[in-house]
Design a protein with these regions (language model features):
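Metzincin-family zinc-dependent endopeptidase catalytic domain
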Residues: 27-143
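Acidic/histidine-rich, surface-exposed loop or edge segments in extracytoplasmic proteins
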Residues: 10-25
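Surface-exposed acidic, glycine-flexible loop patches that form ligand/cofactor-binding
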Residues: 8-11, 52
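Metalloprotease/metallohydrolase-associated module, dominated by Zn2+-dependent proteases
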Residues: 1-7, 80-121, 137-205
């Protein structure tokens, strides 16, 4: 699940991304979040993302909670009015949101993940919500092979989504661009992205 308002411009981080885990759950899955962040770092060519142990340095905060404590965590992060709306319209096990400035640069993302719902759901949630927190937050049911389709559960960072994130974080795609501006630069971007994704996944080009 995502919370970011209308989607009509490119939103992305325009600098280093530092991820902090606030653990309120058992089992403690902080090490697994670190593994996911490292995997994302290795697969997105132009993204500087890593963990931090200093909450003040973080611009992405991942809150791990028990399933029974999820409503309380949503209320704390989003406030009572918005929390009621979230819980009335959805039954989330994980969610992400971000704030952006007037130039559509993401300034902070918040991710909430249930830690005690099993390994597969945990990894599926962490990958999906962390990646959505980086900007591609428009869920769609039209494409069957992406984790950004809420009807699909993967639990890993698949090839198609690697294309999406590598296009988004190519330096030629700037915060605030509209769809026409992005389409105009795609012919220059795609050969680089295809070569990168093929190389890191040992694919034949």
């Amino acid at each position: 699940m995502h919370l970011a308002g209308a989607v009509n411009r490119i939103r992305k981080f325009d600098g280093p991304v530092r991820v902090y885990v606030e653990n309120r759950a058992r089992p403690d899955r902080g090490a697994q979040v670190s593994q996911v962040v490292e995997d994302i770092r290795a697969r997105i060519q132009h993204l500087d993302i890593t963990m931090t142990e200093n909450a003040a340095e973080a611009n992405v905060v991942v809150t791990l909670v028990r399933d029974r404590d999820l409503p309380r965590a949503i209320n704390k992060i989003y406030g009572p009015d918005r929390a009621q709306l979230i819980q009335r319209s959805l039954v989330p096990q994980c969610l992400a949101s971000f704030r952006k400035d007037e130039s559509f640069r993401i300034t902070r993302s918040d991710v909430i993940v249930v830690a005690d719902a099993g390994d597969f759901i945990f990894y599926d949630c962490v990958y999906e919500e962390l990646l959505q927190a980086l900007g591609p937050i428009n869920d769609t049911s039209l494409v069957p092979w992406t984790m950004f389709n809420d009807n699909v559960q993967m639990g890993f960072f698949d090839i198609y989504d690697q294309y999406i994130l590598n296009v988004l974080y190519d330096p030629r795609v700037q915060p605030g661009m509209d769809s026409d501006e992005v389409r105009a630069v795609l012919p220059q971007i795609m050969p680089t992205v295809r070569a990168w994704v093929a190389r890191i996944n040992d694919l034949d080009q």
